[in-house]
């Protein structure tokens, strides 16, 4: 028997193992250290950073510096451990996958949908955000019923909670989905839509940057408001989530989160008096 035969036999045996064996081993290895233990050891907190998403994220192309409400909140959380903030550029859609693959420790803002909760963990809400719309000149809707009319053309970005709201509360309208919020704005500006469904923080920021789109209109009857949370890795050790939850409770209580959000909106030209009272931080 040649020397190479046992090696070939071993290689064949390894090749015959199912792919799930390696996936399971990889997950077991990555799960051996909890988020809290890793942050404590490395003194680094990895944040999902989404460029071009004020008031939460804004990146200066010239300097590479980040600013925005999410940056300030993440710095505050990192300071609990005396840790440095590590920016991992991604998108809102990919941030869930990044948490699952242990590329990041925290991502926000994310709405805790049941589907997302199957894949990742969530902290307590740091914001409760009402929904409303931007409307064409001369059209001033006040309730969802005002949009739920067959002659009206309603725009929303596909796959978002804006779409969920439109289909649930304005099913009789002419509903059109677009790939991005920017395309919805273009439809509104060009007269191809009568209103665009959009969350308050995003809508306020858009009006701050381009006042001709305003005013932003909150819609009632019913009031639709959804929590915004921090997404975290799903793991049996809950100590990291417990610490972040405590940070949220404390900083909401003393008004720090509200101040951070107001400062983030100011990056888009939004003044405090433009922020509706039902938008709670």
What are the roles of these predicted feature ranges?
Residues 31-110, 118:
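Extracytoplasmic small-molecule ligand-binding "clamshell" domains
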Residues 83, 87, 91-93, 111-116, ...:
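A conserved helix-loop-strand patch within extracytoplasmic ligand-binding domains
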Residues 68-80, 139, 145, 151-153, ...:
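Extended ligand-binding regions for polar small-molecule ligands
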Residues 2-3, 9-28:
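N-terminal export signals
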Residues 51, 128-138, 200, 208-248, ...:
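Periplasmic-binding protein-like
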Residues 42-51, 145-161, 174, 249:
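Short loop->beta-strand "edge-of-pocket" segments that line small-molecule binding or catalytic clefts
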Residues 30, 161-178, 215-218, 248-281:
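Ligand-binding clefts/hinges and TM-proximal coupling segments of bilobed small-molecule sensing domains
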Residues 94-97, 110-119, 165-168, 189, ...:
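A ligand-binding cleft/hinge motif common to bilobed small-molecule-binding domains
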């Amino acid at each position: 028997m040649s020397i190479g035969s046992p090696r070939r036999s071993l290689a064949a045996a390894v090749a015959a193992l199912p792919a799930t064996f390696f996936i399971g081993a990889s997950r077991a290895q990555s799960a051996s250290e909890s988020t809290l233990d890793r942050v404590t050891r490395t003194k680094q907190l990895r944040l999902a950073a989404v460029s071009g998403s004020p008031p939460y994220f804004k990146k200066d192309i010239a300097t590479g510096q980040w600013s925005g409400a999410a940056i300030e909140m993440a710095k505050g959380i990192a300071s609990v451990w005396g840790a440095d903030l590590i920016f991992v550029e991604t998108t809102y859609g990919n941030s869930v996958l990044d948490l699952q693959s242990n590329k990041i420790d925290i991502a926000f803002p994310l709405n805790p949908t049941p589907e997302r909760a199957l894949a990742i963990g969530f902290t307590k809400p740091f914001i409760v955000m009402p929904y409303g719309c931007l409307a064409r000149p001369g059209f001033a809707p006040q309730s969802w019923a005002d949009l739920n009319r067959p002659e009206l053309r309603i725009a929303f970005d596909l796959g978002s909670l804006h779409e969920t709201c439109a289909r649930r509360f304005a099913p009789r309208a002419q509903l059109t989905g677009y790939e991005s919020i920017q395309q919805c704005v273009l439809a509104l500006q060009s007269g191809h839509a009568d209103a665009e469904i959009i969350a308050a923080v995003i809508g306020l920021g858009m009006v701050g940057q381009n006042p001709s789109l305003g005013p932003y209109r909150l819609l009632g009857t019913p009031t639709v408001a959804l929590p915004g949370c921090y997404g975290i890795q799903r793991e049996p050790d809950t100590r990291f989530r417990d610490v972040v939850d405590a940070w949220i409770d404390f900083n909401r209580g003393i008004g720090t989160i509200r101040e951070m959000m107001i400062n983030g909106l100011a990056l888009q030209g939004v003044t405090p008096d433009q922020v509706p009272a039902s938008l709670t931080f």
